[in-house]
Amino acid sequence: MSPPNCLLAVLALTVFIGANNALPITSRPIEGNVQRMVWEDWVNLDPEQRNLTKEKKITAKSIFTLPFRHCPQGHTLFNQLCIPQSNIDPTDLVKQELILAGGSNGSPPPPPIGDYDYGDDEESEEIVYDLSVIPTAMQDGLPPSVGTGDQALPSEDAPLKFNIFEKKFPTGTGEHEEMPLPPDMAAATYAKNISTTPETSTSITPTSTTTFAVPSVPSGEASNRIPGGVDLLAAPSDAFSTSTTLSMPTSNTTTTSNKDIGQVESIVLPADQEHDGLVHLVTSSLSDNDSDDSSTTLNGFNAEADLAQLLKVDAFWPVYDGSIELLPPLFSHRKVAPPLSADQDVKTKHAVDAAEKVGAELEEEVGEEEVTATDILPSEEDEYTTETATTTGDTTVAEASMDTSTATSTSGQSSPHPPEEPEIDERENRLVLIKSKVQPVQLTTTTSATATTAADVANSSSSTDRFHYQHFVEDESSTTTATPEPSSSTPGDPIEQSDMPASDNDNLMTNTIGGRGDDDDDGGHKATSEIHVQQELRLINELVKGKQRQQHQPQKQQLEPTSTEITSALTSTSTEDATTTTTTTTAYTNWSKVMPQLGQSTSETAATTETVATSGQVNEISLTATSASTEVKHFSITNRSYRNSKIIREDRLTVEPEGIVESAASTESAGTAATTPNSSSNPDGYTPLWWLPSIGWRLDRHLDGNGEDQSLLLRFFSTFRGSNTAATTR
C-alpha cells in the first residue's frame, strides 16, 4: 500500500506548485502588455501580502479590470487614460460675454491671451480673454456663482439615481398641471360662456371663412357647437360635440348631436376645396328640439361617442381629389344591360309607370315640398352640377341635374333575366344551360310499332338545345337611368348586344349605365371569337341530339333500354315482329376545344317476342319487368365506362324472373351481337380508362387484394404498337 501513497503525495505537490505559477482555472488569455505585467506582479507577491484581509488585497480578478481605474484628484478616466479635468465657473462665461460686448468706457476689447486653457493637450481653437482688465465695479456687479459646489463625479459603487415614475409622479417643474375635463363637463362649461340672446347668433366653423347667419336659434342648442375650435379633420377622435346650424331660403335646419343618430339624413362635403375639416350633418327638421338641454346630458356622452364613430373622417373623405361622388354621371341614350344582382324580382309595367309618374312630378316640384341640403360653397347656377338629396314621403330619389337635363333613378328593370348567374368562359361570354323537360312516353298498341331513328331526332327544333350562347359586354347595372325602355326577349333566344364604347373615366358609379345606343344596330356583324363559340355550341348540340353519324370508328356500343309493352286481348293470340332501332352513344377520341365529340351509331336488332295470352295483366306485368331489368343491367354495365374505379363490373344479373327468361335472353343476344365487333378489336382484353385518349399509350390495371385499382401514379408506359382504334384515328 506504500507505493500508491507515495504517488499520491508526489501528485499533490506537483499540483500545488503548478497552481502557484499557472493561470487561474477561470481565466482567459492575457491580452496586452499591461495585463501581463499585472499578472507577473501577482505571481511575484509573497504569501503574506496575499493573505491580507484588512487591507484591499490584489486578487485574480484584478487583472481583468482596466488600469488606472482610480484616477488622481482632478483627472477623469477616458479611453483607459486619466485626463486632467478643469471645472469652468459659470461666471467666467458671463465675463467673456461682457468682454465681447465691450467695457463701459467705450474702449475696444483687450487682445486675447493664451494663458487660459481648457486642459486640452493640443492647440485650442477657442479665443481666451484676459480677465484682469475688467473694471472692479463691473466685477462687483456680477451675479454670484451658481453651481460652484462639488462637481465631482459620483462614486463608482453608488447606484444610479433616476425617477422611473417621471410620467406618473413628475419631479421636474413642480408646477400644477391642470387635468382635462370630461367631454360632457367641457361642453357644459363651454355652454355657459356662449351668448344666449334669442334674436340672432352667429356660428363660425373652424378653418372656414364662411359665416352663416341663423335667425331665432334657441339657447338650448347653442351648446352643441364644437368646443374650443376643434378641427374635425385633425383630431376626429376628440370631436364629441359636432354641430353646425345652416340657414336656407326654403327651410331652417338645425343639427343637434345629442339626438338620435338615426335622424341623420345627409352629410354635406365641400366639392371644390381642399380638406378643410368642414363636415356638416343635416338632420330632419321634424325632430323635437324643444326639450331641455339638461335632460339630455345624461345620455349625451353615449350618443356623442357613437356619433364620433360615425364621423370618422377617412370614411367620408375620398382618397383622391377626383372622387367618385364629385364626378357627374355620363347620361346618354343607351339601352340598359341586365343588373348585377340576379335575385331581384321582375318589376311589372305598373311599377315602371308609377316610377315614371313620380319622376315627372319631382321635376315640377323641386324646391317646394322638400328638405334640401346643398353644397355650402358658392357655385353658378347653370354651369356647375349640383347634387341634391330629395325626400318626398317615403320614397328617397337621388336626382342629378346637368345643365337643363334631369334624370330620375327608377327601380324598374329593362328586361327579365334568369334567376341564376350563368357561367362565364374565358371570353367574358355566358353559357346558359336550359333544363330539358322529360317527355311522356306513349303506350304502343299491338298493331303499331314505334321506330325511333336518328332522322326523327334531327328534325327537332333549335329551341330544345341545351346550350345557348349569350354575349354580354360587361357586368353592368343601372342605378341612374333616364326612362328605361323595356326590351322583349325570351329565354330561348340569345341576347345580342354590340360593344359599348368605353367611357373617358374609370368611375365606378358613372360606368354602371350599360347597353348599346339607339342608333346602333347589329346588322349581323359579330366578332370572330363569337362566331367560333357559336359554331362550337352548335356542333355540341348536334352531337348530343344525334345529328352526325360517325360509324367508321368502332367502339363499345350501348344498348339503351327498349321497353315495349304489348297489350293483348284475353281471347286472342298474336305474334308480331317488332323491329326496333336502338340509338347508342359512342365517345370518340378526336377531341374538340370545348368537350369531346359524341357520335351516334345505330344498330338494328330484330327481336321476336311470342306471347300467348292467357291473362292480359300477367303479360303486361312480365314484359314491364323485363324492360326494367334489362334497363338496369345495360345501364350499369356499359354506360359508366369505369368512370369510378370502385364500381366493379358485373357480367350478368344475379336474379332474373323465371317467367321472362326467354325475353331477357333475346335482349342479351342482341346486346352481344352489337358488342362483338368492338371486343374483337382488343384481343388482349385491354379496356382503356375513360379519361385516357387513344394516343398509343396504354395504362394497365393492377388490382389489389380488395379488387380495387392500385395507385395510378407513375404507371404510364408505351407499348409502341397501339391498338386498332388508335391506328384508325391517325
Swiss-Prot record:
Upregulation: Controlled by zygotic patterning genes.
Ranges annotated as biased composition (Low complexity): 197-211, 386-415, 478-491, 567-583, 663-676
Residue stretches of biased makeup (Acidic residues): 361-385
Residues carrying a glycan: N51, N193, N252, N289, N459, N590, N639, N678
Signal peptide limits: 1-21
Keyword rRNA-binding among UniProt keywords: no
Localization, UniProt: Secreted, Extracellular space, Extracellular matrix
PTMs per UniProt: May be highly O-glycosylated in its Ser/Thr-rich C-terminal part.
Tissue: Expressed in the invagination primordia in a pattern that precisely precedes the pattern of constrictions.
Gene Ontology BP annotations: actin-mediated cell contraction; apical constriction; apical constriction involved in gastrulation; apical constriction involved in ventral furrow formation; axon guidance; G protein-coupled receptor signaling pathway; glial cell development; imaginal disc-derived wing morphogenesis
Gene Ontology molecular functions: G protein-coupled receptor binding; receptor ligand activity
Record field: compositional bias (Polar residues): 504-513
Protein name as catalogued: Protein folded gastrulation
